[in-house]
From Swiss-Prot:
The chain crosses the membrane at residues 7-27, 358-378, 387-407, 458-478, 510-530, 546-566. Signal peptide: none annotated. It comes from Brucella melitensis biotype 1 (strain ATCC 23456 / CCUG 17765 / NCTC 10094 / 16M). Residues 36-82 are annotated as: Disordered. This is Membrane protein insertase YidC. Keywords: Cell inner membrane, Cell membrane, Chaperone, Membrane, Protein transport, Transmembrane, Transmembrane helix, Transport. GO terms for molecular function: membrane insertase activity. Belongs to the OXA1/ALB3/YidC family. Type 1 subfamily. GO terms for cellular component: plasma membrane.
């Protein structure tokens, strides 16, 4: 039965390897193939569009009356057909008002009142504070144009309502800060006046208060629209199934919607009508831009893809019709989140503004119920330690304490099984020719001695969801981005940057990515090797080979994982070795580690010459 226990442990580890292989190798490979097919299809569509392009693209991509997503106005003049523009040249094409907050800098384009120029002050492209700040939004005339826009759709009775080409007029203050909102106005030929007040907090939430004043002689009906538009896929778009990057939103009772770029290219248009409570946007790994309508009013949400002159991805929403009588006014408030997906900030916005499931803007994954609490625990401990790496080590100890009863019971059962090895050997020899009686005798022995032959599997199986949950925390939470540990580990969310194949930087050449086997993966592999040697070598040659090669396989596999995860795995295995050693010693069971290590280096006797 000892062999069966080893067999089940082998199966559990094999399943883990296959799962990791699927997620981190086959998944990206398949996604890359799909990406190549997508690019080829885009090129074909672009050629076709160039031959059949119409002078105007005013139908289909911005919500008009009646309240139908197809009524949204076109994206306006992007001036993308000419020579490529620099960012400064694109920004200089239209009048703007400056944005300056503790977290953001940029400007609002007065043409369309677009938020299309935004940098994140607190985040840089690399671990160096001297590297460029993260660029979130960019003018539509650039190749990677990315903007947020709020406007209105109307009809003949309303006249021209604010849209992508409307030039707003600034009243008073012309710099947006947390303490100084800005006011924009526009009056059309039907005596409708639109007054927009834009405010921003210290973090990443913009509040847009629109007032429609009817100074005309007839009742009018119009609707408010909003959209987040991105031209071309981002260069950093993830090719794995571990993380969602693309269009995203919560659609009332339909819940969370995650639409990858490739999916919306296939479907072109995905709509949800009569939604109450939710939001729409586009998300990256660490950043996002979203539109948040009034949570107690109906809206229509839509995800779409256009190929008029270049690929364009869009998340938009359209309010229910607003009726404004002569001499009366109507108000509507929308919010725009544009910034870093800081966990506590997102959670506070959800609570403060009652935004439905806004916390799902962060991709917590399948093990949401483990991943999110684990992050909060790590974050809480970080407040005391000041180092996320140390916090992970402390959390590992706490997890060991939490699962101690289960692990303790398992190790005790394993220790008792080792004490029973002589009796088990006796049974095998006694019933060598009768497997049925051998199994019956074994089961009676287990029952009499209160041994669970599968107990050793539990410590391994319990680690699997914890492993994936911690990986998710390290991979998706911005708090872990560029978080240092000690020494050469300056980013826990990135792989160990060293490699044994250039002697950890002593040799002056760059090592290929697949040979980046750093210090911590090697430490993890050695500790895993020692853990495997805590038990006798399985008599079955196949199992023995698997147990021998398992640490080497894991060393290569985990080398490309976040350093924080490798450190966790090494520390967790170290604690397991200590725990197992103490329990075995208390049970009077011999620890096989040292004998197994001696056996590796002991010179085998030469066979006698025949």
């Amino acid at each position: 039965m000892e062999n069966k226990r080893n067999f089940f442990i082998t199966i559990a580890l094999s399943i883990l390897i296959l799962a990791l292989w699927q997620v981190f190798y086959l998944g990206p490979k398949t996604e890359a193939q799909r990406e190549q097919a997508r690019i080829e299809e885009q090129q074909r569509q672009a050629q076709q569009a160039a031959q059949n392009r119409q002078a105007s693209s005013s139908t289909g991509d911005t919500p008009q009356m009646p309240a139908n997503p197809d009524s949204i106005p076109g994206q306006g003049d992007t001036k993308a057909a000419g020579a490529p523009l620099t960012r400064d040249a694109a920004i200089a094409q239209s009048p703007r008002i400056e944005i300056d907050t503790p977290s953001l800098r940029g400007s609002i384009n007065l043409t369309g009142a677009r938020l299309d120029d935004l940098y994140l002050k607190k985040y840089h492209e690399t671990v160096s504070d001297k590297s460029p700040e993260i660029e979130l939004l960019a003018p539509s005339s650039l190749k990677q144009g990315y903007f947020v826009e709020l406007g209105f759709t109307g009809n003949d009775a309303t006249g021209a309502v604010p849209g992508p080409n409307t030039v707003w007029v600034v009243e008073g203050n012309n710099k947006l800060t947390p303490s100084t909102p800005v006011t924009l106005t526009y009056t059309n030929d039907k005596n409708l006046t639109f007054k927009r007040v834009i405010s921003v907090d210290d973090a990443y939430m913009f509040t847009v208060d629109d007032t429609i004043i009817n100074n005309g002689g007839s009742t009018v009906s119009l609707a408010s629209y909003g959209r987040v538009t991105r031209f071309n896929q981002p260069e950093h778009a993830s090719a794995t199934y571990v993380l969602h990057e693309g269009l995203i939103g919560v659609m009332g009772q339909d819940g969370l919607q995650e639409i990858k770029y490739a999916k919306i290219e296939d479907n072109k248009d995905i709509s949800f009508k009569d939604v109450i409570g939710g939001w729409v946007g586009i998300t990256d790994k660490y950043w996002a831009a979203t539109l948040i309508p009034p949570q107690d009013e109906k809206f229509t949400g839509r995800f779409s893809h256009f190929t008029n002159d270049r690929p364009r991805y869009q998340s938009d929403l359209l309010s229910a019709p607003l009726t404004v009588a002569p001499g009366q006014s109507q108000k509507i408030q929308n919010r725009v989140f544009a910034g870093a997906k800081v966990v506590n900030t997102i959670q506070n916005y959800e609570t403060k503004y009652h935004i439905k499931q806004f916390d799902l803007l962060i991709d917590w994954g399948w093990f949401y119920f483990i991943t999110k609490p684990m992050f909060y625990l790590i974050d809480w401990i970080y407040k005391f330690t000041g180092n996320f790496g140390v916090a992970i080590l402390v959390v590992t100890v706490l997890l060991k304490a939490l699962f101690f009863p289960l692990a303790n019971k398992s190790y005790k059962s394993m220790a008792r099984m080792k004490l029973m090895q002589p009796k088990m050997t006796e049974i095998r020899e006694k019933y060598a020719d009768d497997k049925m009686k051998q199994q019956q005798a074994m089961m009676e022995l287990y029952k009499r001695e209160k041994i669970n032959p599968l107990a050793g599997c539990w410590p391994v199986l319990v680690q699997i969801p914890v492993f994936f949950a911690l990986y998710k925390v390290l991979y998706v939470t911005i708090e872990m981005r560029h978080a240092p540990f000690f020494g050469w580990i300056q980013d826990l969310a990135a792989p160990d940057p060293t490699s044994i194949f250039n002697l950890f930087g002593l040799l002056p050449y760059t090592v290929p990515h697949f040979l980046m086997i750093g210090v911590w993966p090697i430490i993890m592999g050695i500790i895993m090797f020692l853990q495997m040697r805590m038990n006798p070598t399985p008599p079955d040659p196949t199992q023995a080979a698997i147990f021998t090669w398992m640490p080497i396989i894991f060393t290569f596999m985990l080398a490309s994982f976040p350093a924080g995860l490798v450190i966790y795995w090494a520390w967790n295995n170290t604690l397991s070795i200590i725990q197992q050693s103490v329990i075995m010693k208390r049970q009077g069971v011999k620890i096989e580690l040292f004998d197994n290590l001696k056996g590796l280096f002991r010179r085998k006797p030469k066979e006698a010459n025949k």
